[in-house]
Amino acid sequence: MVKKFAFIQPLICDGNLTPPLGTLIMSAIIEKEGWDVHFFDERFNINAVNSLIDFQPNMVGISAVTASILRGRDLADQIKRALPETIIVLGGPHPTAMPEEVSVWNSIDFVVVGEGEYTIKDLCDWYLSGREPSALQKIPNLCYTFNGKFIQNKNRAFLSSSELDILPRPAYHLLNIEEVFKEMTHGLFQKGKRILPVMFSRGCPSQCTFCCRVMGYQIRYRNTEMIMNEIESLVRDYNLDEVWFEDDNFTANPKRAHEILDSLIELNLGVYIK
């Protein structure tokens, strides 16, 4: 059976254009399961959805924040009209905060809330094993509408530090990397620099009312040596100018933050750290 999975990043006009770390980790997980995975990004290619339709995937993942959720819905509608048999999955901060509201959209088959790495893998396994509706109930962090009723499965526990350590590295090879480096922008760095994000930890103990808290209150840290190996590989493979820590709260534990920074000083890679 042909196994094609496509992720698409909706256009968003907030001035920040950076690779989606979570989506690229999910891409790597699905690739390991033998799927042909493609990543399309409207922010860098305005014709991304047409390229996705030409790819004719079995399943599509769309990740959206509030600022891009309506465009995400438009993309789902366009894809479903062209490929009615394709399964469309919506995830990201906005669907996590409001799963019932988005699950009723006609073009959305499933909503993934919270950390999606293993939920999306379970959903791919379900797709290949006969697509029995009753089997969906066993997939944590999954929401959907069945016979007109909204169903939200139990939540999966947040990934532990040891589980974060065994996640594959982001599938940066799926990007048109030179185009990304050329066009990538963010308030933290200068356009045109060769920059990639790295994850040191997930979660934040603060309880700010404006935050959607997708990753939870408890911080889980990755192994320092593994992070150093990843950064060293990224700098070497992509000739980076800078590395950007995309953590919820990098300095929540000053001791761990100093450990990372001291290790980077020892590596002496000659890149900026942000």
Residue positions per predicted region:
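Nucleotide-activated donor-dependent transferases that construct or modify glycoconjugates
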Residues: K3-D14
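Glycine-rich beta-alpha loop elements in corrinoid/cobalamin-binding modules
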Residues: K4, G22, M26-S161
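Conserved residues at the C-terminal ends of beta-strands
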Residues: I8, S63, G114, T145, ...
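A short, glycine/small-residue-rich beta-strand->loop->alpha-helix junction that serves as a flexible
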Residues: I12-L21, A64-I69, R194
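Glycine-/small-residue-rich active-site loops that bind phosphorylated ligands and cofactors
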Residues: D14, A67-S68, H94-P95, Q218-I219, ...
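Conserved alpha-helical elements of sugar-nucleotide-dependent glycosyltransferases
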Residues: T18-I25, M226
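Conserved ATP/PPi-binding loop(s) of AMP-dependent carboxylate-activating enzymes
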Residues: R156-I177
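Radical SAM [4Fe-4S] cluster-binding motif and immediate context
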Residues: P170-K274
